[in-house]
Amino acid sequence: PEIDLKLLDGQIINNENMQGKVVVFQFTASWCSVCIKEMPHLEKEVWQRFKDENFILIGVDLKEDLEVVKEFISKTEVTYSFTIDSDGSFFESFTLPKAGITRNIVIDQEGKISFLTRLYDELEFAQMIEHIDKLLK
């Protein structure tokens, strides 16, 4: 899909500046208990491991206000970038209608979806990390 996101820090992420990078979109919300469980693992096992490579991890908060999202980020102690999908259209560009929110979508260096997860399953999460590692080698 066409990607044009403004991150909370003002940075713009789009198809053009994603080229050549591995990008993970982590769809989340402050009310999502599975997301909250997964986020420390994303921070420690994915972001801290790959952040110095050609890699971007973006938390995409679904339909929440800026203050709620800021508090959510603070509470979960993650340091990766965030954006707000205020109307859910970005999320829906990757999913079926009424899909569950907890998911990670890995985009390869050519802009293609190369891996996705649903919910938080330790085995699937480990496979995602292995997949990212292979893409970056």
Describe every region a protein language model picked out.
Residues 2-23, 94:
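A short beta-strand-turn-helix
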Residues 24-25, 57:
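Hydrophobic beta-strand anchors of alpha/beta hydrolase catalytic cores
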Residues 27-44:
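Conserved redox-active cysteine motifs that mediate thiol-disulfide chemistry
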Residues 29, 62, 87:
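Active-site loop/turn elements of alpha/beta-hydrolase fold enzymes
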Residues 48-53, 77:
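Short helix-capping segments at alpha-helix termini
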Residues 58, 70-109:
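Short, internal strand/loop/helix patches
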Residues 102-137:
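Thiol-/selenol-based redox modules, centered on thioredoxin-like
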